[in-house]
């Protein structure tokens, strides 16, 4: 949510910054709503002042024993008018808030302008894709040959975009998440959390999934309940960030560095026909999520740090990747600045996103009403989040980049302790 004060005082500046995202701010609606709000505010305050004056006159008349019947009639009529004005103001304020919630975050000045992923800027590359002396297979073919990935059974159980993993492939998937958790807790200073896998609508509003992106979620409505509505989490960013919702934090407690390993659930409503093969785009997938809560002046440095923490996973796994600075048109709704990490997938002969690390500024903090206490006042925190990493896509990268000519998969050295020293995945465990 944008700063309402800046939106009112500098609407043209806000419009120019949003235009860099190819978002058109409806200035006429903004001005109309603001003018109407001011008028109703003045009207309501005048009616309240008159009511207070009449109440004082009634009290004074009672003391003097005067006939105050006419004053009672007037104050009752005034109450009806005031109630109507207050209701009208409340309805308008709801519309104003809905309008404000529909606005994306303002991009940082360092973010390049562009319409889509073709305009993103490559910052650096690490590692070189291997040169194979044999035709490299994709992860689907590898997984099926090793009988470790079963998409047919998953389709019978739940439909498309699900998978059943078994044997050493399932163990490799688990080893990846354990390795990531250990790295981020032991070396990078994150506190691990276990969080709910479904959340209420207030939480989704706080991090920006609602009201705009409701169709991307799997919603849960308990039978016989009209008010208890939930959704499965699309990312652990939602429960982790909302742990500080409606709180005033001590400045000395910042930064907060939180982490969770959870399944993530996404409807992929806008992805029909895209990545229908394999593990790249699933309705359910595991992810290790990193979240930081910082002071405003520290958030850009924290973004570099958080992104480096995600990069460490790829480096230790010796997976080639590149770091991309997203352009204004490709950033997420609530992001101020975003880096994507794209890992090389030998089966697709291309780089694919495996982590997205974003500085949200105070966008989420305003929605959640999360502040920290300074010596002079309470200020909104800045929030950051990033994947450290998406476990399924990391599994894909390991399978495709560590495949051997005989169809086996070499287990990366850093993962072998998590797999009882196993060096190669050759066939399914009995």
From Swiss-Prot:
It is found in: Cytoplasm. Gene3D superfamilies: Bira Bifunctional Protein, Domain 2 (3.30.930.10), Serine-tRNA synthetase, tRNA binding domain (1.10.287.40). PROSITE patterns: AA_TRNA_LIGASE_II. L-serine binds at residues 235-237, 289, 387. Pfam families: Seryl_tRNA_N, tRNA-synt_2b. Its EC number is 6.1.1.11. The keyword Nucleotide-binding applies. Consists of two distinct domains, a catalytic core and a N-terminal extension that is involved in tRNA binding. This is Serine--tRNA ligase.
């Amino acid at each position: 949510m944008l700063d309402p004060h800046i939106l009112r005082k500098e609407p043209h500046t806000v419009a120019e910054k949003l235009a860099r995202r190819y978002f058109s701010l409806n200035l006429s609606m903004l001005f109309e709503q603001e003018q109407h709000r001011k008028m109703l505010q003045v009207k309501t305050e005048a009616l309240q002042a008159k009511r207070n004056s009449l109440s004082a006159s009634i009290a004074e008349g009672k003391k003097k024993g005067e006939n105050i019947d006419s004053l009672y009639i007037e104050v009752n009529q005034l109450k009806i008018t005031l109630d109507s004005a207050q209701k009208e103001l409340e309805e308008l304020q709801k519309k104003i808030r809905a309008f404000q919630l529909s606005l994306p975050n303002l991009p940082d000045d360092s973010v390049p302008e562009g319409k889509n992923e073709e305009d993103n800027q490559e910052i650096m590359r690490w590692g070189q894709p291997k040169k194979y002396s044999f035709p490299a297979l994709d992860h689907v073919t590898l997984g099926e040959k090793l009988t470790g990935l079963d998409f047919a059974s998953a389709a019978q159980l739940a439909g498309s975009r699900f998978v059943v993993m078994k044997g050493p492939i399932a163990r490799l998937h688990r080893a990846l998440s354990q390795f990531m958790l250990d790295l981020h807790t032991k070396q990078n200073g994150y506190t691990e959390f276990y969080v709910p896998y479904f959340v209420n609508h207030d939480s989704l509003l706080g991090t920006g999934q609602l009201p705009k992106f409701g169709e991307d979620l799997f919603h849960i409505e308990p039978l016989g309940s009209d008010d208890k509505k939930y959704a499965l989490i699309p990312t652990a960013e939602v429960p982790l960030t909302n742990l500080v919702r409606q709180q005033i934090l001590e400045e000395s407690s910042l930064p907060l560095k939180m982490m969770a390993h959870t399944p993530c659930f996404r409807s992929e409503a806008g992805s029909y026909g895209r990545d229908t093969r394999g593990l790249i785009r699933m309705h359910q997938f595991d992810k290790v999520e990193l979240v930081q809560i910082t002071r405003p002046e520290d958030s850009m440095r924290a973004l570099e740090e958080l992104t480096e923490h995600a990069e460490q996973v790829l480096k230790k796994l010796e997976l080639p990747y590149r770091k991309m600075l997203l352009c204004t048109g490709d950033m997420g709704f609530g992001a101020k600045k975003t880096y994507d990490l794209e890992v090389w997938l030998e089966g697709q002969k291309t780089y694919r996103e495996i982590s997205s690390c974003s500085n949200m500024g105070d966008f989420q903090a305003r929605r959640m009403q999360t502040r920290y206490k300074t010596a002079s006042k309470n200020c909104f925190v800045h929030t950051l989040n990033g994947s450290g990493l998406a476990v399924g896509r990391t599994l894909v990268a390991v399978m495709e980049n560590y495949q051997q000519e005989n169809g086996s998969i070499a287990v990366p050295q850093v993962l072998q302790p998590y797999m009882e020293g196993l060096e190669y995945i050759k066939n399914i465990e009995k």
